[in-house]
Amino acid sequence: MNTDIANQLRAAKKATTDLNLIQSDTRTIILETLAANLEKHIENIIQENQKDLSLMLEQDPRYDRLLLNKERILSLANDVRKVASLPNPLGVSLLEKSMPNGLSIKKITVPLGVIAVIYESRPNVTIDIFSLCFKSGNVCILKGGKEAHFTNSYLLLLIKNTLKNFNINTDIVCLLPPERALMTQLLNATGLVDLCIPRGSQNLINFVRDNAKIPVIETGAGIVHTYFDKSGDLGKGKKIINNAKTRRVSVCNALDTLIIHADRLKDLPELVETLSQKHVIIYADQDAYHVLDKNYPEQLLIKAKPQDFGHEFLDYKLAIKTVPNIKAAIGHIQQFSSHHSEAIIAEDESAIDQFLIEVDAAAVYANASTAFTDGGEFGLGAEIGISTQKVHARGPMGLEALTSYKWVIRGTGQIRD
């Protein structure tokens, strides 16, 4: 292992003791101070962010993820304040029992320990991760992508300067070099890192899962579907589809495939009408293409190929699949879903119930946009990632997901027969 990396990880592990001694009220004050520092240094953050942006083409789908402007920085500071205001997740009693032999048993929440998060071109994640880890008593190891190196480095400087002002050990957070070659060393750091959370492309997540010797929670990749049922309301459908697809195309909760009941194909041109205003390219199956031909801009309409389904576009692109019934819609989702977010637009309550019960995803929606799959929108303050697995945590991971528990047993001298 690279000596510098090994030393950083050892220092981080050692710092867990110092972090656990910080009182909850102090952690809250420090996070509020960090939020104020973000607002105070908006121009400096934008200046560093521009250095990163200058190395990327504006047409790159990652450009929007990388961009930090005044509005986004203010929102980021507000998210930190929301996390600061949340109840302390540590020391919460999950279970209390008094046993017949006189033993008192409690199950209480504790930090996970050292959490490593590997992410790509979203520098706001740097602040989200630190605020959630700090509030929940976890040391965090940050490994951002090279695309955001200047921005991440400056944000880390703000974090460390804030900690120094409170005489807090700054080893509780570190930013590893962006070189991908160092990732294997991190993934092999058994005994030093308690959990790794990859956030980014499916390739990144697959690499981490396949090469890690430390525990991993898979997050991020979202192949998202919305099914417009036979009973769907056209007005609701237009708004939901437009929002889910075009609000922010570069995020994991953005719509990738619209599934439509064959009986409602006549309404398809109106359903996707607003998408043409955002120049959304549609990859339509044969039935959908026949209906949209001459009803959607020719240069934006393409006949779908098999590989267009089950694809996370992260761009102004949408696949459309026609199905004869809800069973086929659910079957298509089961085949291609990444188990992130799936939605149905319907007025038939039995169809809604069937969809919500049978579709296997971290978040399932009825008559709402999948854009809501977000820690802030779920009232979690922020999120460290959106888990697409079932073990330990699922969906947006807030403070509660960053804790484990331990059993505390008090006795008066009892021994077991």
From Swiss-Prot:
Q: Does the keyword Amino-acid biosynthesis apply?
A: yes
- How is this protein annotated for GO cellular component? cytoplasm
Compartments it resides in:
Cytoplasm
> Which pathway does the database say it acts in?
Amino-acid biosynthesis; L-proline biosynthesis; L-glutamate 5-semialdehyde from L-glutamate: step 2/2
Predominant place of localization:
cytoplasm
Enzyme Commission no: 1.2.1.41
**Does the keyword Amino-acid biosynthesis belong to this entry?**
yes
Catalytic activity reads: L-glutamate 5-semialdehyde + phosphate + NADP(+) = L-glutamyl 5-phosphate + NADPH + H(+)
User: Which cysteines bridge via disulfide bonds?
Assistant: none
- GO MF annotations for this entry? glutamate-5-semialdehyde dehydrogenase activity; NADP binding
Keywords carried by this UniProt record: Amino-acid biosynthesis, Cytoplasm, NADP, Oxidoreductase, Proline biosynthesis
Q: Could you provide one GO biological process annotation from this protein's UniProt record?
A: L-proline biosynthetic process
InterPro entries listed in its UniProt record: Ald_DH/histidinol_DH, Ald_DH_C, Ald_DH_N, G-glutamylP_reductase_CS, Glu-5-SA_DH, GPR_dom
Give the family, as the similarity comment puts it.
Belongs to the gamma-glutamyl phosphate reductase family.
**HAMAP family the record matches:** ProA
UniProt xrefs under NCBIfam families? PRK00197.1, proA
What does this protein do, in the record's words? Catalyzes the NADPH-dependent reduction of L-glutamate 5-phosphate into L-glutamate 5-semialdehyde and phosphate. The product spontaneously undergoes cyclization to form 1-pyrroline-5-carboxylate.
Q: What protein am I looking at?
A: Gamma-glutamyl phosphate reductase
Q: What gene is behind this protein?
A: proA
